């Protein structure tokens, strides 16, 4: 059973998501407690492969209030856990022009914190405008159909 803690809705607005992957996260005790309370922000975070390891940057986890001296640094880089084969496949794909790894959601699967990564390509401004126009048109059609019945 999955319990979703945080979603990165802005990623769907800023990027075309091509593929999705699941990875575990190496966390400290106070980070897990803080995540369980929902005190996490994925907005500006991204993942990068360095020395054959997958790392997550800029994910903000607020310090745990009862953590005192055992607390963690809120924006420290966190190691993501995936099979070496999967990491190498991702490494090849992220070397392509314009592709990046963006976290889409953070959730607990059983007792383990997992993150869903998206292989993404950045949207241009006109793509965003086009998408908004389509959404508005669909909303207008829906409104017209509702008014008719």
From Swiss-Prot:
<dbReference type="InterPro" id="IPR023620">
    <property type="entry name" value="SmpB"/>
</dbReference>
<dbReference type="InterPro" id="IPR020081">
    <property type="entry name" value="SsrA-bd_prot_CS"/>
</dbReference>
<protein>
    <recommendedName>
        <fullName>SsrA-binding protein</fullName>
    </recommendedName>
</protein>
<comment type="function">
    <text>Required for rescue of stalled ribosomes mediated by trans-translation. Binds to transfer-messenger RNA (tmRNA), required for stable association of tmRNA with ribosomes. tmRNA and SmpB together mimic tRNA shape, replacing the anticodon stem-loop with SmpB. tmRNA is encoded by the ssrA gene; the 2 termini fold to resemble tRNA(Ala) and it encodes a 'tag peptide', a short internal open reading frame. During trans-translation Ala-aminoacylated tmRNA acts like a tRNA, entering the A-site of stalled ribosomes, displacing the stalled mRNA.</text>
</comment>
<dbReference type="GO" id="GO:0005829">
    <property type="term" value="C:cytosol"/>
</dbReference>
<dbReference type="GO" id="GO:0003723">
    <property type="term" value="F:RNA binding"/>
</dbReference>
<dbReference type="Pfam" id="PF01668">
    <property type="entry name" value="SmpB"/>
</dbReference>
<keyword id="KW-0694">RNA-binding</keyword>
<dbReference type="InterPro" id="IPR000037">
    <property type="entry name" value="SsrA-bd_prot"/>
</dbReference>
<keyword id="KW-0963">Cytoplasm</keyword>
<comment type="similarity">
    <text>Belongs to the SmpB family.</text>
</comment>
<dbReference type="GO" id="GO:0070929">
    <property type="term" value="P:trans-translation"/>
</dbReference>
């Amino acid at each position: 059973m999955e319990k979703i803690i945080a979603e990165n809705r802005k990623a769907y607005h800023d990027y075309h998501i091509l593929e999705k992957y699941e990875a575990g996260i190496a966390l400290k005790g106070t980070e897990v407690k803080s995540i369980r309370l929902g005190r996490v922000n994925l907005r500006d975070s991204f993942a990068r492969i360095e020395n054959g390891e997958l790392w997550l940057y800029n994910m903000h986890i607020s310090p745990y209030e009862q953590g005192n001296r055992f607390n963690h640094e809120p924006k420290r880089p966190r190691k993501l856990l995936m099979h070496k084969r999967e990491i190498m496949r991702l490494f090849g794909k992220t070397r392509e022009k314009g592709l990046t790894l963006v976290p889409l959601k953070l959730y607990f699967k059983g007792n383990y914190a997992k993150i869903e990564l998206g292989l993404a390509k950045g949207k241009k401004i006109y793509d965003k405008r086009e998408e908004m126009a389509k959404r508005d048109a669909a909303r207008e059609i829906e409104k017209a159909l509702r008014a008719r019945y």
